[in-house]
């Protein structure tokens, strides 16, 4: 028989290989697959492997011009999801040669590209990725990392405190700068541009940068502490984004900010490289993440977006609070917090970690807890996140009945009280409220904050459980 065998054949004949032994250089993926009725799970898993690597819907003549065995993705394992009908975890291994070095963009285009619209699947979710050390070494990663940031700021042994300036839209640059100054002067380490503050008619970016720089220098001089404001450099083009980052550096600002999902991984990686070369810290906001990660059976889990950010580069990233107004279950959140901070993370299915991940020498990222948190949450936050974190109170600072600076004082006093209590061996989980009450006796600012928020709770079940 001359030529090749044309026609359509089952994916599983080529792409389902349960006997395959994964290599150290493979990128491994765990997908939650919901096949259409009548599609066997092996075929669905193989289809995912094929469509996200070398396959197409029919045999093509040009397959003969390459070595499919060398380049194809392989579904090497399938397991049913306990408690779910017709859902499976499909494990897929991709040879490293399929991916461009140092490009999160290219990695995602393959692994979570067209395959998510594939008709034979009702739904598909990427739960986790194991990124091999060989691929990690092609990335710069975070511009500075946790230790370098602490050294730059000269702040040790406690979480850092931040505040998002509200109202998020509508303030003039001068009034915005004033709010920044008051918060920093009151005792916060950082203030933050809201993610949707870019350069709007009511406040152009250059004016905001100038007034915020003034606020930073004034509050530094008065407190003797190093201060920062996350200047949001996110823009409509990469060139404009870089222009803003360069201006921030010229002002001597310590940190800039980027919305990495709406801005895109290509822009983010460029900015991260600039930040390392020029000594700027990079704060990352995850606006749009819930569009991708909130549905349990379709999309991509945030732990994958977090890993991708560590590769692309950022020194801080928003990572949920466990206790505030935004989604995040405790064990799952702590799972990806470890993936952001630690050098080596063991597989632990109870926390949603499907693979052991070795980050080799990539710096760590500080998780940022932000969204609906206030002084009564401080003991829980200190206990859950530990020292290497940024705790951000927007309304929880600016909503103080006496104003912004007293709001900042209340948060700083609450934090210092929790850290001291923990260092003295007290149990923050059990004695948290008592610790805050004791501290409020000698801090009228904290007492006023405690009174305002004593009954506020955001209690809904988490949507994204294991």
UniProtKB/Swiss-Prot annotation:
GO terms for biological process: photorespiration; reductive pentose-phosphate cycle. The active site is at residues 166, 285. The disulfide bond which can form in the large chain dimeric partners within the hexadecamer appears to be associated with oxidative stress and protein turnover. GO terms for molecular function: magnesium ion binding; monooxygenase activity; ribulose-bisphosphate carboxylase activity. Mg(2+) binds at residues 192, 194-195. Binds 1 Mg(2+) ion per subunit. It is found in: Plastid, Chloroplast. HAMAP family: RuBisCO_L_type1. Belongs to the RuBisCO large chain family. Type I subfamily. RuBisCO catalyzes two reactions: the carboxylation of D-ribulose 1,5-bisphosphate, the primary event in carbon dioxide fixation, as well as the oxidative fragmentation of the pentose substrate in the photorespiration process. Both reactions occur simultaneously and in competition at the same active site. This is Ribulose bisphosphate carboxylase large chain. It comes from Cucurbita pepo.
